UniProtKB/Swiss-Prot annotation:
Summary of the tissues where the protein is detected: Detected in head.
Record's GO cellular component terms: cytoplasm; mitochondrial [4Fe-4S] assembly complex; mitochondrial matrix; mitochondrion
Localization per record: Mitochondrion
Domain of life: Eukaryota
Binding-site residues for Fe cation, renumbered to this chain: C58, C122, C124
Record: transit peptide: 1-24
Function as written in the Swiss-Prot or TrEMBL entry: Involved in the assembly of mitochondrial iron-sulfur proteins. Probably involved in the binding of an intermediate of Fe/S cluster assembly. Required for maintenance of circadian rhythms under constant darkness.
Organism: Drosophila melanogaster (Fruit fly)
Name of the protein in its database record: Iron-sulfur cluster assembly 1 homolog, mitochondrial
InterPro entries xrefs: Fe-S_cluster_asmbl/transfer, FeS_biogenesis, FeS_cluster_insertion, FeS_cluster_insertion_CS, HesB-like_dom_sf
Family: Belongs to the HesB/IscA family.
Any one GO MF annotation of this record: 2 iron, 2 sulfur cluster binding
Quaternary structure and partners: Interacts with cry.
Length: 130
């Protein structure tokens, strides 16, 4: 069950990338795995993060990230390097083939979804269309 928003996320359309079938709908970079582990250290009652999608922004869709205390019945579960990410039923098709990364700079830090299925993004990178 999701409890609250964890972080903001940026979406990037990846052009010219070949889709390579994987077992998981979503793959995590080592930086994303490390950040998720760090976030969950302070939340012993939470078992992972939940990725969802909602109507928002100038391009229509936006990803959401929440803490998850359990896997809901229709969630897809991704387990990688000791962390669990649950994908909400409504977000499953939009995340196929996506890589979840965590990027830090001097001014910001955020999860980034590198999604080859996105047709367009807004200027700020927070919303996308498929």
């Amino acid at each position: 069950m999701a409890t609250r928003v964890v972080a903001t996320a940026t979406v990037r359309a990846v052009k010219g990338r070949k889709l390579i079938p994987t077992r998981a709908a979503l793959t995590l970079t080592p930086a994303a795995v490390l950040r998720i582990k760090t976030l969950l250290q302070d939340k012993p009652d939470m078992v992972g993060l939940k990725v969802g999608v909602r109507q928002r922004g100038c391009n229509g869709l936006s990803y959401t990230l929440d803490y998850a205390s359990q896997k809901d019945k229709l969630d897809e579960e991704v387990v990688q390097d000791g962390v669990k990410v649950f994908i909400d039923k409504k977000a499953q098709l939009s995340l196929l083939g996506t890589e979840m990364d965590f990027v830090e700079s001097k001014l910001s830090s955020e999860f980034v979804f590198n999604n080859p299925n996105i047709k367009g993004t807004c200027g700020c990178g927070e919303s996308f269309s498929m």
